[in-house]
Amino acid sequence: MRFSIRRFFSAASGGAIILLLSALLGLLLSNSFLSESYFKVLHLKMPFSALDDAPNLAEFISIAPMSLFFFVVIAEIKEEIISGHLASFRRVILPLISALGGMMIPACLYGLITSGHLEVSRGWAIPIATDAAFTLPIILALGRHVSEGARVWLMALAIFDDLLGIVVIALFYASHLNGYALFAAGLITAVMIGLNKKSVQNLWVYASAGVVLWWALLVSGLHPTIAGVITGLALPSVADQPEKASPLERGKQIIAPWVTWLILPLFGFVSMGMSLSAMSFHVLLAPVPLGVALGLFLGKPIGVFGATIMATRLKIATLPKGTSLRMLFGLSLLCGIGFTISLFIAELAFSGSDFLVPAKYGILMGSLLSALAGWLWLRFLKFPAKGV
C-alpha cells in the first residue's frame, strides 16, 4: 500500500467534515426562506436534446460528477487487490463475508417491514451501504480504542460494500434499454479493454473513451455512473517504465481531490435538500423511513456481525490481529452509517416520487443512531486483546 492507513484515514476525516457541512447547508437552505429558490435551481432541466426525459440539475449531479466518485472507488479496490490489503485470500475473505452479510440482512429487513407495499419495493437496496467517508474518521478519532487490524478490516469491508453497491446499481436500477446505445457502449468497452491489453499508457485516450461511454450508457438506459467503473477497470495498473506512475495511479491522483473536496460535498448539498416540516413520529413510522432506518441501525450490524461470527466459528477466516468480537460488534454498529451510497440509491429508486423524502428521513435517522451507538460502544467499553 502506497500510503499509511493513518494518512488514508486523515484524508477521509477532512473530506467527511466538508461533506457533512455541505449536507447540513443543503438541509438548512431547504428549510429556510430561501427554500423556493434552492429547489427551483435544483429542478432546472439540463439541455440534453437527445434524451426524451432530460435530467434536472440535481439528477445531473448524481449521474455526471458521481461517475468520477465511482472511478476513484474502483481504482482503490483495484490497487488494494493487486498490491494492498486485499492482495491475499486470507485478508480478503473475512471483510468480504462480513460485507455480504451486511448487504443481505438490511435488504431483507426492509422487505419485511414494507411487505404488502409493492410501490416501495424498489427501495430495498437503500440500507445496504456503509459510508466510509463518515465511518473511517470516527474510528480514527477513537484512537487506541480500535486496533490497527480492526481499522484495516473496516476499510476492506467498506471497499467491498462500495463494490457490491455498484453491482446492485448496474443490475437493478436500469431504466428502459436502448439497444443501439447499449451496443455502442459495449463496443467502446471492448475498445478500452483492447487498449489495456496493448498497455496503452496515454491517460487521455481512456478519459476520452470514458466520456463517450458515459453518454452511450446515459442514452442506453443503464446508469451512466458505470462508465466510471469501466474506465477504472480498463486503465492499466502497471507503468511501462518503472520510474513512472501507472495510468490508474495518475488518474486517481488527478481525480481523487476533486471527488473529496468538491463532488461529494456538492452531492451532499443537493441530496440532503428536503423539507423537515412534514417530519413527525407518524411519518417516521411509515414503512419506507422505518424500513430504511431499521435496515441501517439493526440490519447492518446484525448482518455484518453475524456473518463475521459465522466465518470465524466455521474457521473460514480469523479475526484481525489485536481484535476481539466485542470490538468488531462496535464497528458493525458504525457500518449502519449509510449516507452517500444510500442517498444515491434512494434517488434512483424514488426519483420524482413522494417516497424520496421519507427515504431520506430514514437514512438520516438510521445513520445518526448508528453513529451514536457505535461511538458509545467503542469509546466506553474495555476490550481484551483476544477472545470475545
Curated annotation (Swiss-Prot):
GO molecular function: sodium:proton antiporter activity
UniProt key word Transmembrane: yes
Record field: transmembrane: 8-28, 57-77, 93-113, 123-143, 152-172, 175-195, 210-230, 254-274, 278-298, 328-348, 361-381
Cited InterPro entries: Na/H_antiporter_dom_sf, NhaA
GO cellular component: a single term: plasma membrane
Principal location class: membrane
Compartment(s) where it occurs, according to its Swiss-Prot or TrEMBL record: Cell inner membrane
Catalytic reaction list: Na(+)(in) + 2 H(+)(out) = Na(+)(out) + 2 H(+)(in)
Superkingdom: Bacteria
BP terms from Gene Ontology: regulation of pH
Membrane topology: Multi-pass membrane protein
Pfam families according to UniProt: Na_H_antiport_1
Record's keyword terms, sorted: Antiport, Cell inner membrane, Cell membrane, Ion transport, Membrane, Sodium, Sodium transport, Transmembrane, Transmembrane helix, Transport
Described purpose of this protein according to its UniProt entry: Na(+)/H(+) antiporter that extrudes sodium in exchange for external protons.
Family: Belongs to the NhaA Na(+)/H(+) (TC 2.A.33) antiporter family.
Matching NCBIfam families: NhaA (TIGR00773)
Protein name: Na(+)/H(+) antiporter NhaA
Lineage: Bacteria, Pseudomonadati, Pseudomonadota, Alphaproteobacteria, Sphingomonadales
Gene encoding the protein: nhaA
